[in-house]
Swiss-Prot record:
<protein>
    <recommendedName>
        <fullName>Large structural phosphoprotein</fullName>
    </recommendedName>
</protein>
<dbReference type="GO" id="GO:0019033">
    <property type="term" value="C:viral tegument"/>
</dbReference>
<dbReference type="GO" id="GO:0005198">
    <property type="term" value="F:structural molecule activity"/>
</dbReference>
<comment type="similarity">
    <text>Belongs to the herpesviridae large structural phosphoprotein family.</text>
</comment>
<keyword id="KW-0920">Virion tegument</keyword>
<keyword id="KW-0597">Phosphoprotein</keyword>
<feature type="region of interest" description="Disordered">
    <location>
        <begin position="312"/>
        <end position="333"/>
    </location>
</feature>
<feature type="region of interest" description="Disordered">
    <location>
        <begin position="522"/>
        <end position="555"/>
    </location>
</feature>
<dbReference type="InterPro" id="IPR010340">
    <property type="entry name" value="Herpes_UL11/UL32"/>
</dbReference>
<feature type="compositionally biased region" description="Polar residues">
    <location>
        <begin position="535"/>
        <end position="555"/>
    </location>
</feature>
<keyword id="KW-0946">Virion</keyword>
<dbReference type="Pfam" id="PF06070">
    <property type="entry name" value="Herpes_UL32"/>
</dbReference>
């Protein structure tokens, strides 16, 4: 790059030419360091009148050192000539030592590495001096640099090394010779190796020092310029500041110099603006002097009279103690509806902050009829908003203005708000209860006429209180207490019933299974007695069954009259009459057990419902019974033979039904998701059978196919001991009746306690 293209500024063309000749001939100069050439630095000085412009001079010095750094990097020699001479002499000495088997004593001379030569040269110099002392008689002192050289030769070698240090870009190798052969061939090569090593270290070290000096000077000049323009906030100064803030290393100097050359106009302009007065950072902003804000004391009494007296005294103190004149009173009727919506609902700066800034005007505002009317209207707004807090519906400001179109103007300032608060009756807590206890809808607000009042116990009373405003706080708490008492009573009854059922199933498993088998036999005989009796007997049985239903209904009705003993006697007489109708010729089927269990569950459900346990218990029992009865009815259709089938073919018919049931291809559609497994999962009852598994019952509908066959074929054998089984069956039925009596008695006493 020619010097005419270098980004120097504010200097003459003659100075630029002088600088150009300096860098062109820098290799031939005795000293390369710019600091040793003050006539070069003087060409970069920029004067404004009779004074020196420091910032512009710093910029030219920055460009000078950047270009000096680039020149050092471009003209740096590789010193290969010196290195090759070193290797040539090292080979001569190594061969000499190997011939005489002395190489082990001078291990540092075996091989040289160019990278680590500077650190290894100290050891090499010691071995060379040691070897020269061995070859040349006499001793060599440690202070000596060479072996047996004259003073003139040593001075010439030192001068040559100093020139190489001052100008590392161009050097001359000094030739050490021995024309009279005074030292010999090998001693002369030792001195040559010592000189070449010192020359290589001097050249490389001086170049590294000069490159570091140039880089450090560049950073110093750059930081000085940054400090000078950092307060300027114009565009060119900020842009120049960003460019000069780039961090620099030895490898980034070239790219940085390219950026300075491309943005020469912007950077020089920013330095020219440095002479102008610097603007403050707040000059472009609007300056304001806020008026002092008065502090108010906390009012303990919010009555009308106390407020008026306190504010009258406060306004007098403000008018006498303030240093500024209050503004004249402005009527609120002059404000438009847009200002009303903006101040009331948006909370704008004009509506809210103006009341704070103009506190003296507000306190001196007269209490005329207009302000009082506005306060009343604001009071109605607050009341309406308090009543609608349960709505949780967001309205736009325009909607609220339309909703309260009866208001012509909005209250302005703190005086109107205080007047409104003075009219609020804070001692009446009816509406406060509404705000605290009313439920909040988070997502979607339901219509008021479609709210489910049964979703919670407290909502109906609050809704009536919100709409009519008639019920008092005592009535609300009383109704809530009654509802809570009902819940506690219901939970206590359910807990007692569960405890009674747990007592039933605390018997050992074997005894319980035996009792259930007898119960199944008895239920089977009751279910199928119509198949073998004559028509007349069937009619009588139907009549007795009807009497049984009537007696059950009568029993439930007598619970309300506390006549439990009479109803239980009728139930015992009905059960004993049925026992006399047993027919031993009819075989037992496994489906009758769960049918009887379902029938007894239905009876117990009805008793519980009639005793006042509530709708939730009924729903729970109904769901459980429907679940059990669905599988029961489905199994009954498959396992139970038709009525016209001969009794002797029942066993064969059941075998075929079991095969069809186990065959997935011929399975009935009702049993697509039903399968018999060797180990059935336990089915737990939600209410009637706590801690009991259905598979404990000897029921064919819940047993595996093999167990079902064994049960069917063993039914005839069980009938041979019918008399004995009937005795055990009577004991089992008596126990069941005792359990039912306990349950009904418990429910009756619970109902009496409630009454």
């Amino acid at each position: 790059m020619k010097m005419s293209h270098l980004p120097f500024a504010w200097i003459s063309d003659e100075a630029k030419c002088f600088l150009s000749r300096f860098f062109e001939n820098i290799s031939s100069l005795p000293v390369v360091d710019i600091r040793e050439n003050p006539w070069i630095l003087s060409q970069c000085i920029v004067k404004t009148g009779n004074s020196i412009n420091n910032v512009k001079t710093l910029y030219n010095n920055l460009i000078l050192w950047i270009y000096f750094h680039q020149t050092l990097c471009k003209k740096k020699p590789d010193y290969e000539e010196v290195w090759q001479e070193i290797l040539k002499v090292q080979k001569i000495l190594k061969d000499y030592l190997e011939q005489r088997q002395m190489i082990t004593d001078y291990s540092s001379l075996t091989s040289f590495n160019k990278v680590g030569f500077e650190t290894e040269f100290k050891n090499v110099a010691k071995d060379l001096l040691k070897l020269g002392s061995f070859l040349r008689w006499g001793t060599v002192t440690h202070a000596a640099d060479y072996v047996n050289l004259t003073t003139e030769e040593r001075a010439e070698i030192g001068e040559n090394l100093q020139k190489a240090k001052n100008n590392m870009l161009s050097f001359t190798i000094y030739q050490i010779v021995d024309p009279w052969n005074e030292n010999g061939y090998y001693v002369t090569n030792i001195n040559r190796l010592l000189y070449l090593g010192n020359l290589l270290i001097t050249l490389h070290g001086s170049w590294m020092n000069m490159e570091k000096l140039a880089l450090n000077t560049i950073n110093e000049k750059k930081n000085a310029i940054l400090k000078a323009i950092e307060n300027n906030k114009n565009f060119v100064s900020i842009y120049s500041y960003q460019i000069l803030s780039l961090p620099l290393t030895s490898h980034r100097v070239t790219s940085f110099f390219k950026i300075l050359t491309e943005d020469f106009d912007v950077i020089t302009k920013s330095l020219e603006l440095h002479a102008l007065p610097v603007k403050s950072t707040w000059d472009d902003r609007v300056k304001f002097t806020p008026e002092p804000i008065q502090t108010f004391k906390v009012l303990t009494d919010l009555s009308k009279s106390s407020l008026s007296n306190q504010f009258e005294s406060s306004s007098k103190k403000t008018s006498h103690g303030s240093s500024f004149n209050p503004e004249p009173f402005i009527k609120t009727e002059q404000r438009s509806n847009n200002t009303l919506s903006k101040d009331l609902f948006v909370g704008s700066e004009d509506g809210l902050l103006s009341s704070v800034k103009k506190d003296s005007m507000i306190l001196d505002e007269p209490r005329n009829s207009t302000s009082i009317n506005n306060s009343k209207k604001m009071h109605r707004i607050l009341q309406t908003e308090i009543l609608d807090l349960t709505d949780q519906t967001m309205h736009r400001p325009e909607d609220k203005v339309n909703q309260f179109n009866e208001i012509a103007v909005a209250p302005d300032g703190i005086n109107q708000v205080i007047d409104t608060l003075s009219k609020l009756d804070l001692h009446n807590s009816n509406k406060v209860i509404d705000i605290v206890s009313s439920p909040k809808v988070n997502v979607v607000q339901l219509p008021k006429n479609k709210i489910d009042y049964h979703s919670t116990f407290f909502l109906p009373e609050n809704e009536v209180n919100r709409q009519n405003g008639v019920q008092s706080r005592d009535q609300l708490s009383k109704n809530s207490t009654n509802d809570l008492q009902k819940i506690l009573e219901l939970r206590e009854r359910i807990k007692t019933i569960k405890q009674n059922n747990e007592d039933i199933f605390k018997l050992p498993s074997e005894k319980r299974r035996k009792e259930i088998v007898h119960e199944n036999l008895q239920s089977f005989d009751d279910e199928h007695n119509e198949m073998s009796l004559p028509p007349q007997d069937q009619k009588s049985i139907k009549q007795k069954n009807g009497n049984k239903a009537n007696s059950s209904t009568k029993t439930l009705n007598m619970i309300g009259t506390n006549d439990v003993n009479a109803s239980m006697k009728e139930k015992e007489s009905a059960s004993s009459a049925k026992k006399n109708q047993l027919v031993k010729d009819v075989k037992w089927t496994p489906s009758s057990s769960l049918l009887d269990l379902s029938r007894r569950n239905d009876l117990l459900q009805k008793e519980l419902f009639e005793s006042g346990l509530g709708e939730k218990v009924k729903k729970l029992l109904t769901d459980f019974t429907d679940t059990i009865s669905l599988e029961e009815r489905s199994l009954k259709d498959v396992l139970e033979p038709p009525k016209k089938t001969d009794v002797s073919n029942i066993a064969t018919f059941n075998d075929n039904n079991l095969k069809n049931l186990l065959n997935s291809r011929k399975r009935d559609p009702l049993f697509q998701n039903f399968s018999f497994t060797e180990k059935m999962q336990p089915v737990r009852s939600p209410f009637f059978l706590p801690n009991a598994e259905i598979q404990d019952f000897d029921s064919g509908s819940l047993l595996t196919g093999k167990e079902t066959q064994n049960t069917i074929f063993g039914a005839s054998k069980a009938q041979e001991n019918g008399d004995k089984d009937l005795i055990d069956l009577e004991n089992s039925v008596q126990k069941d009746d005792d359990i039912v009596n306990k349950l009904v008695s418990h429910l009756t006493h619970s109902e009496e306690d409630v009454v």
